[in-house]
Amino acid sequence: MAAGSASSLGGGAWPGSEAGDFLARYRQVSNKLKKRFLRKPNVAEAGEQFAQLARELRAQECLPYAAWCQLAVARCQQALFHGPGEALALTEAARLFLRQECDARQRLGCPAAYGEPLQAAASALGAAVRLHLELGQPAAAAALCLELAAALRAVGQPAAAAGHFQRAAQLHLPLMPLAALQALGDAASCQLLARDYTGALALFTRMQRLAREHGGHPVQQLELLPQPPSGPQPPLSGPQPRPVLGSTLPLPQPPDHAPGSVAPSPGTLGAFADVLVRCEVSRVLLLLLLQPPPAKLLPEHAQTLEKYSWEAFDGHGQDTSGQLPEELFLLLQSLVMAAQEKDTEGIKKLQVEMWPLLTAEQNHLLHLVLQETISPSGQGV
């Protein structure tokens, strides 16, 4: 191409000569894919030429045209029944569309072409995800879901991003539960950005349940298994001596640290414990914000609020399923009491004390709780 075609292509206005140059090359390669009598089209060669044209257009910042060339590469790879190559070309096309959208928003402050590049990117990445799943690569599929979700969140579409974060969590859960919990946490944050507080509460509740299921310490489970006796093993042939009972049982431990106990501190891994703390605090704040009527209060939400009532206070500040530090638990308990009594001044004082203990997201929820207490809407938020 001529050197001046870069600016004209990047700006979206094509004089006839530059347009003819690109279109002539594109049509020339496309003609090689047409079926002719007694001649088989050379699909591999056409795919390589489309890829070369895409690289040239990308170097000239002609992003949408480079993306369309990558889609042509994907069609060639599909004709060759090469799934990995097709997925790679679709992913590259989607990234070019996303880059076009981000550049347009930075320069113009509005979506490019009424958001069509964003829709094209979502479609291409969705096809790539399906291909990776067909190839038995759920981790790669989840990574693409996370990439699309992060892009949607960056361009101001948190509601759409939340769905892709949840799909990534679903793909990660069987093999990487901690990554799945992180994706669910991102989805919950997107729900909060979209002001879908009911959906965020449901996600935090699900996260808490999954963290308890997958966060058990493996050492505790191993302690419950019989231990082989020390020393040389007897030969396999002949009668085997019966092992002594004392050699197969774990050593006695204090009641608070017995194997299989429900005490969370030694039994939950640190990362999962952090997830439990975040979910517990966020769920309490969301329940205070939404103020669901008793008829619509789910049992798990009712149990959460009951833990912070004075009647359930057991002298240690929390039950055995909690992970909160005692100071934070007592402050949350006071906050629940103040919110139930509509004590605005008490909530303001607690907000000052709780501010350094909460995340920015949780502090925003606490601010919304205070605003709802000052100016109640009658229906939560």
Swiss-Prot record:
Residues 221-265 are annotated as: Disordered. RAB5A effector molecule that is involved in vesicular trafficking of early endosomes. Mediates the recruitment of HTT by RAB5A onto early endosomes. The HTT-F8A1/F8A2/F8A3-RAB5A complex stimulates early endosomal interaction with actin filaments and inhibits interaction with microtubules, leading to the reduction of endosome motility. It is found in: Cytoplasm; Nucleus; Early endosome; Nucleus, Nuclear body. The gene is F8a1. This is 40-kDa huntingtin-associated protein. Coiled coil: none annotated. Produced abundantly in a wide variety of cell types. InterPro entries: F8A, TPR-like_helical_dom_sf. GO terms for biological process: negative regulation of proteasomal protein catabolic process; vesicle cytoskeletal trafficking. Keywords: Acetylation, Cytoplasm, Endosome, Nucleus. Residues 226-242 have a biased composition (Pro residues). The modification N-acetylalanine is found at A2.
